[in-house]
Design a protein with these regions (language model features):
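Positively charged interface segments
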Residues: 10-89
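Short alpha-helical segments that sit at the start of domains
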Residues: 1-5
Length: 89
């Protein structure tokens, strides 16, 4: 998971951004596919993000786009988010 968090082609850390947990996990599974890694389950992925939020400057929120769970301070490449995402990659 640490290697994924450093993969700037998939995820970027910016204080004024936010991303749904679903989109973060989608980017992670694509990274795993591209790097021949086996992904951890989504629950374990989310637990990792919560546990390491301070290390990456993330803040958990239940109100991403008004109704989704996710994190502030991060965005994913637009290919991993829906067309209407607020991603500013």
């Amino acid at each position: 998971l640490t290697q994924f968090m450093q993969a700037t082609a998939y995820v970027r850390f910016k204080p004024d951004t936010e991303e749904r947990s679903t989109y973060l996990y989608r980017a992670y599974t694509k990274w795993c596919e591209d790097n021949l890694e086996s992904p951890v389950p989504q629950k374990k992925f989310s637990q990792f993000l919560l546990k390491n939020a301070g290390k990456y400057g993330l803040t958990f929120s239940k109100h991403i786009e008004g109704k989704y769970r996710g994190f502030r301070g991060v965005c994913v490449h637009p290919a991993f988010a829906a067309a209407y995402s607020n991603s500013t990659f």
